[in-house]
């Protein structure tokens, strides 16, 4: 997962009171409380292949969007009693979206800074 300042558009990591993973809620399905969560799903995941295939076979369309959400699979696995962990391991700048010229400029600045740093080390 990643913690970002503006999680608009991203799936949110929902945790219980003890900080354990509960689910991933897509932005368009999120409540106001969930939209306030800054921990997001950056679309990186590791699964046991057999368990993933079993879960995909049970996956239903989201009633709001009509889409199939891969992000529903970890909650399904959790509900089936399987161990699901969500680790905060992705730097915020590695999950930035590029949908506008301003976002492109931001990512360009970050990349140029990284390239300059690599060139000097």
Sequence positions of predicted segments:
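Short beta-strand-to-loop element that shapes/binds the nucleotide-sugar donor at the catalytic cleft/hinge
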Residues: 1-14
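Catalytic-core segments of class I nucleotidyltransferases/pyrophosphorylases
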Residues: 22-95, 99-113
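Short, intrinsically disordered, charge-balanced linker/junction segments flanking boundaries
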Residues: 115-121
């Amino acid at each position: 997962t990643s913690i970002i300042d503006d999680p608009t558009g991203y799936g949110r990591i929902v945790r219980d009171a003890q900080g354990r993973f509960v689910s991933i809620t897509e932005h368009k399905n999120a409540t106001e409380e969930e939209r306030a969560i800054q921990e997001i799903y950056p679309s990186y995941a590791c699964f046991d292949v057999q368990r993933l295939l079993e879960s995909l076979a049970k996956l239903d369309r989201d009633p709001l969007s009509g889409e199939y959400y891969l992000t529903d699979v970890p909650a399904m696995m959790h509900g089936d009693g399987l161990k699901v962990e969500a680790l905060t391991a992705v730097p915020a700048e590695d999950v930035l979206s590029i949908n506008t010229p301003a976002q492109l400029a931001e990512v360009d600045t970050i990349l140029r800074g990284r390239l300059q740093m690599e060139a000097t080390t």
